[in-house]
Design a protein with these regions (language model features):
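Residue-level signal for inorganic ion chemistry
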Residues: 24, 60, 82, 161, ...
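Structural signal for hydrophobic packing residues in well-ordered secondary-structure cores
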Residues: 49, 53, 68-75, 79, ...
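Short, well-ordered beta-strand elements within core beta-sheets of diverse protein domains
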Residues: 26-33, 48-54, 138-139, 253-256, ...
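Conserved C-terminal structural/oligomerization subdomain of aldehyde/semialdehyde dehydrogenase
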Residues: 25-29, 217, 254, 308, ...
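Residues at or immediately preceding the N-termini of alpha-helices
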Residues: 21, 35-38, 57, 75, ...
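ALDH superfamily catalytic-core signature
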Residues: 188, 219, 227-365, 388-389, ...
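Rossmann-like NAD(P) dinucleotide-binding subdomain of oxidoreductase/dehydrogenase enzymes
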Residues: 116-263, 385
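N-terminal Rossmann-like NAD(P)+-binding subdomain of aldehyde/semialdehyde dehydrogenases
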Residues: 1-125
Length: 482
């Protein structure tokens, strides 16, 4: 663990084993923190906050750029950890590293986006709005793209002057936190500005509770399941603390009648099966105009069956393992439930160990668990539609709204549909998986609240203060005058 600029053991000296789905074996021994360790990290971040907040935008930007350089320098080692610890395909590991570095370099622009405002005011009064950082921010990140999401969130939070305590997922303590802490150490970032606390599932509840309830914590950033996000939001709300959350998704791709089918198949395959479908913005539903549904489906099935499954160190085999046996069981339950209730399997449906075949379903109905609930694995359903209004009604009826995509013959036609999709993000003539470092990233409905990136990070992780200066012309009632 990394607390106050030092590598420390858990106070209890307890450890847990970090599991590798690639090798189906333990990967590393990790210190297992409890509430006391998190309190220590929060205290360190609190003490570091005044000096960090007082730095100029140029000084904070310089530190963030040094973090990016340190990640780049250690890139080969980090990529190896991404493959071994969470089962990233080698192509994904390189992409995760590249995008993570980009978040820190883009984050160096965010300090300059914090703008004060001068308000029109009565004569004799100077009125202004000042933005200031919040203080210590708790950051909780998931295992599926750990370095990417830890970088996406913390870069903006630190850029505007806050300090951070980060708890990576128990499934990805190395790639979600430890390698990032090493970059902060190498970059010479002042002690206490960025702290990493690791823990096992056994201690998640107490450590997480401390990250919300500790009075020194001023805001919480959480990326993970909607169920846990709701619990955190409820507790934080009772304490009047700001929250920003990116939660589950049930993201839809619409393929209109004049879409380029080849591009649509490519976008669908990447969106549905990248990282074995373990992506929050991955494609889980494909709505295809019935006029082209047969051709699209046939070509999509052929592409899906051709995808390589196996050793993720091999660039030709992009479909790797699910993260753990519990994830496998959940996917199997959703698939069996769908089949038992009448769904048809057009491709896949089998597994060998944690390696689950890319799977395509049709005839999925509302009674099936996979219809409206998040599916965190390589299963996608195809829904032919008659009218776009019908497709939009079904898409928007689901409680999630993270990402979406529309494929059509013209951008204008697709844009009209995109504007009617209830999702925080939507991509025209592209797939659901896409991001840019300074763009606002986040969802609506049960997919979260708040945004990350660029000016959105400024809005989410600073507070407005109204300051006035009286210049001697205000008149009080005479009985109050001295």
């Amino acid at each position: 663990m990394y607390i106050n600029g030092q590598w420390v053991k858990s106070q209890s000296m307890k450890t847990y084993m970090d599991y590798s789905p690639v090798n189906d074996a333990n990967y590393a021994e990790i210190y297992d923190a409890d509430r006391n360790d998190m309190q220590q990290a929060i205290d360190a971040a609190h003490k570091a906050f005044p000096a960090w907040a007082a730095l100029s935008p140029e000084e904070r930007a310089d530190y963030l750029l040094k973090v990016a350089d340190a990640l780049e320098k250690n890139g080969d080692e980090i990529s190896k950890h991404l493959i071994e610890e969470i089962g990233s395909w080698v192509g994904k590991s390189k992409a995760d590293l590249t995008t993570s570095i980009a978040f820190w370099r883009a984050g160096a622009k965010i300090p300059f986006m914090v703008e004060d405002e001068i308000l029109t005011s009565p004569i004799g009064k100077k009125s202004m709005v000042k933005r200031s950082p919040l203080g210590v921010v708790s950051v909780i990140t998931p295992w599926n793209v750990p370095l990417n999401l830890s970088s996406r969130t913390t870069s903006g939070i630190l850029a505007v002057g806050n300090t951070v305590v980060l708890k990576p997922s128990e499934e990805s303590p190395i790639t979600g936190g430890i390698v990032l802490a090493k970059a902060f150490e190498d970059a010479g970032v002042p002690p206490g500005v960025f702290n990493v606390v690791t823990c096992s599932r056994k201690h998640v509840a107490e450590v997480g509770d401390e990250m919300v309830s500790n009075p020194l914590i001023k805001a919480i950033s959480f990326i993970g399941s909607t169920t846990i996000g709701r619990q955190i939001a409820t507790k934080a709300g009772s304490l009047f603390k700001k929250t920003s959350m990116e939660l589950g998704g049930k993201d839809a791709l619409i393929v209109m009648d004049d879409a380029d089918i080849s591009k649509a198949v490519t976008a669908a395959a990447f969106g549905a099966f990248f990282h074995a479908g373990q992506i929050c913005i991955g494609t889980k539903r494909i709505y295809v105009d019935q006029k082209i549904a047969t051709e699209f489906t046939n070509r999509f099935v052929a592409k899906t069956k051709a995808l390589g499954i196996g050793d993720v160190r091999d660039f030709a085999k992009p479909i790797g393992p699910l993260i753990n046996p519990a994830a496998l069981e959940k996917i199997k339950q959703q698939l069996n439930d769908a089949i038992d209730k009448g769904a048809s399997v057009l491709a896949g449906g089998k597994h060998e160990g944690l390696y689950f075949e890319p799977t395509i379903l049709t005839n999925v109905t509302k009674e099936m668990d996979t219809y409206g609930n998040e599916t965190f694995g390589p299963i996608v359903a195809i829904y032919p539609y008659t009218t776009i209004a019908e497709a939009l009604q079904e898409i928007n009826a689901v409680d999630y709204g993270l990402s979406g995509a529309v494929m059509a013959g013209s951008d204008e036609k697709a844009m009209k549909v995109a504007m009617q999709m209830e999702s925080g993000m939507c991509h025209v003539n592209d797939g659901t998986i896409y991001g840019e470092p300074l763009a606002p990233f986040g969802g609506m409905k049960n997919s979260g609240m708040g945004r990350y990136g660029g000016k959105a990070s400024v809005d989410s992780f600073t507070q407005q203060r109204w300051i006035t200066v009286e210049q001697g012309t205000r008149h009080y009632p005479p009985m109050f005058n001295e």
